[in-house]
Amino acid sequence: MTNNLKVAVIGSGISSLTSAYFLNQKYDIKLYEKNDYLGGHSNTIDINYNGKNIAVDIGFIVFNHQTYPNLKAFFELLDIKIAKSQMSFAVKILEKNLEYAGTNLNSVFAQRKNLFKPAFLKMLRDILHFNKSASNLLNQGVDLNYSMNKFLQDLRVGNYFSQYYLLPMASAIWSTPLEKIGDYPAQSFVRFFKNHGLLTVSDQPQWYTVDGGSKQYVNKICENFSNKISLNDEVKSIEVLSNLNSRNIKIVSTKGEDFFDKVIIGAHSDQALKMLVNPTDLHQQVLGNIKYQKNLVVLHKDSKVMPQNKRAWASWVYTKYDDSQNSSNIFQNLPSNLAVSYWMNNLQNIDQNYPIFVSLNPKQEIAKEDIFHQKIFEHPIFDSQAIKAQSRMQEIQGLNEIYFCGAYQSYGFHEDGISSALRVLNQLYIKAPWQ
């Protein structure tokens, strides 16, 4: 049963889709999406690989039950089929001829020479030292100005640990250049690591992927309001009119204009700010203080992005190239210290006879005939300025009946997106069945 209030939902990532799914049960909604597909970072690409049809995700790929409780509950409500995934991490440093993975002892010492390398062995000891010290840090008072760089200096860990373990792993997780990771507030960084079981060698969570690709859940969510979705329809402006009548929020988009009582913006914070006509100082201070990093995502079949030593292959591979590796093709002008590849066969249980990879900002040349798809994604950079902006998000929620949701409000992951949507829904007196 719906009332006559009209609500606009802008964007179709997990935050917007969650909002629209539950708002549709109470209000008359309209969802705007500027792209020609729904899902935002949930982007499944259907490819033909030597005659075999394969669905591959290039954005959202995996989740677990412990640290994604709302996503787990939503998938169960939607009856989404999931499959176990295998999460592991590897590092490939070309200038040092260094390759290793954290899967097991055999992969840690994939290069047997590292058994006799003091710096590498110290790195392993530093991992244990960091894990213990990081847990202690969480018991101290919060200081957003205490950065990861300062924390690592205080721990006196070796360069191998910082440059070839911790910062590459974090860079891969947050899709952020290595040189910017050190600016992250240490406690926020460590809290994420602890919540995801990254401060312990044992007790790792079981990871899952959506069977058939993330498009399965996107399609299921949209079933009940497919006639209320406007694709290829970018919102140009959102203006709050001075009249006190109902539907006093005017939206101008690619396809025309419409009027609403409430608006939920699930776009990135910088995009949301640009949409607002005459934003308040509060909007500027909160939405304007989160920066974003452009990253090129390439879906391809070139196994050269993986370690040369097969023992060091893992689901996520961070690669650091030397300067001579920078190619002169479309991959130039990308973050100098961020190149990550995902082994999709391992992550999404794809037939190993069809090697398939997703690479973020690859520096080496990938033959055009090996590329299936490529796309630019933007990821938030969680420096101290962003963390402070996050803490003030509630100050702008509901101002002039405009609300904001998005994974940028926390750590940038799917659980953060859905959680932000639930906070907005709760403010509108709507609760999910599992709440």
Predicted features by range, described:
Residues 46, 101-103, 329-435:
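Conserved flavin/dinucleotide-binding core of flavoenzymes
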Residues 15, 37, 270:
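Conserved Rossmann-like nucleotide-cofactor binding loop
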Residues 45-71:
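N-terminal glycine-rich dinucleotide-binding loop that anchors FAD/FMN and/or NAD(P) in oxidoreductases
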Residues 65-183:
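Mobile amphipathic helical/loop "lid" adjacent to a hydrophobic cofactor/ligand pocket
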Residues 234-378:
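Mid-domain catalytic core of redox enzymes
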Residues 5-31:
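N-terminal Rossmann-like FAD-binding beta1-loop-alpha1 element of flavoenzymes
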